[in-house]
Curated annotation (Swiss-Prot):
Alphabetical list of SUPFAM superfamilies matching this protein: Adenine nucleotide alpha hydrolases-like
Protein name per its UniProtKB record: Cytoplasmic tRNA 2-thiolation protein 2
UniProt-annotated location(s): Cytoplasm
Cysteines paired by S-S bonds: none
Keyword set, alphabetical order: Cytoplasm, tRNA processing
């Protein structure tokens, strides 16, 4: 008996109707999801097989979950891969996954509390351990930050130790003047918090949920902000200046492909906090460099996906130069300051003697207006 005739068969399996076009190829949902999974699978191979690392003992990795689409998709994919590995009679050494949620409402007042979503997370992915902390817990996990922020803003901010941790951090963030500086400072704070937590629970590495689109935007934005020297760890897989490995398993996938994958699984829609749609009425001067670059990459990526992909591929080929042991690190963002003598960011008097800032962090200080 002849098989069922398909009007638009999947080019991979030929057994189901194609529903989406993936890089010029028409695929069904199953084959589309398999493609996305495989991209992440290859990126996680070193940890799965424990290449160049001990084969026995714990190998704990931290996944910071922003509750957005990309990091939620990464968690979903890794959970499925771990389940498949555990079902084998002779599984590979593998890794343990710990998920960190920084309470969204502690980062942005417009974000809702994640109480219900956090409970759903634990129910949906019971194999893994979860922790939820507010952004202001950075004072507890990274005590050195307290001295840094009191010196960072100079006259623009006075740290009051009598206030609660939340009030102190809110006051510091409010002292940052421009939209670009606010986004930049928040990114540094979140990174420091994630790294401090990863070290606390002895994680080998951090798995960031940045897609190719996001990494391309971050590359362009960091160069524009003077953070080009940090690209070797902010967009590349490998060791960070903090002594913890940074990896980006979604780096071979475009944002649109990640979005399509998320639409296949109803359980993801219940835990994802949707991104606010970009407003068309916002003046360009009121947008941060990061927002401008993300809009640019998303719009141009639809027209020229290969060009945008090359941005990330080129950046991933960058290699950190050998850093002498005596090279200082930026007191705020942690970047190595190879040209520290000329950045103008170091304070050399009184209690501020120890504060050294890289060029980009110096530009974010409130008193700098030009």
């Amino acid at each position: 008996m002849p098989g069922k005739q398909l009007s638009d068969p999947c080019v991979d399996c030929s057994d189901a109707e194609a529903i989406l076009t993936l890089r010029t190829r028409r695929l069904c949902q199953t084959c589309y999801a398999r493609f996305v999974n495989f991209k992440v699978f290859k990126r996680m191979e070193n940890y799965r097989l424990r290449r160049n690392m001990p084969k026995t003992g714990p190998c704990k990795l931290l996944l910071p979950l922003s509750c957005g689409i990309s990091s939620s998709v990464l968690l979903h994919i890794l959970n499925a891969q771990i389940q498949l590995e555990l079902a084998k009679s002779h599984p590979s050494p593998g890794f343990d996954l710990h998920v960190l949620v920084i309470e969204p409402s502690s980062i942005s007042h417009s974000s809702p509390s994640y109480d219900e979503g956090f409970g759903l997370l634990q129910q949906t992915f019971p194999l893994h351990s979860f922790t939820r902390i507010p952004l202001h817990s950075i004072f507890e996990l990274d005590p050195e930050l307290q001295e840094v922020i009191s010196q960072f803003s100079k006259d623009g901010f006075v740290d009051d130790a009598g206030l609660s941790a939340k009030e102190r951090l809110d006051a510091f963030r409010a002292s940052i003047p421009t939209s670009t500086s606010k986004v930049d400072v928040d990114y540094v704070l979140i990174t420091r918090l994630v790294v401090a937590f990863a070290k606390k629970i002895a994680c080998r590495g951090v798995l960031w949920g940045d897609s190719d689109t996001r990494l391309a935007a971050k590359t362009l934005a960091n160069v524009a902000k003077g953070r080009g020297s940090s690209l070797t760890w902010q967009v590349c897989d490998g060791m960070s200046p903090f002594g913890v490995e940074f990896n980006f398993p979604l780096r071979d996938l475009f944002k649109a492909e990640v979005d399509n994958y998320a639409s296949f699984f109803p359980e993801l829609t219940r835990i994802i906090i949707p991104d606010e749609p970009p407003s068309e009425n916002v003046l360009t001067k009121n947008l941060s460099i990061d927002e401008l670059m993300m809009r640019y990459v998303q719009t141009q990526g639809e027209k020229y996906p290969g060009v945008m992909a090359n941005v990330t591929r080129t950046a991933s080929k960058l290699q950190a130069s050998l850093t002498p042991a005596n090279v200082p690190q930026c007191s705020f963002c942690g970047a190595f300051m190879l040209n520290s003598g000329n950045n103008g960011g170091g304070d050399t008097t009184g209690a501020s003697r120890a504060l050294e800032l890289c060029y980009a962090c110096t530009r974010s200080r409130p008193e700098l207006t030009c």
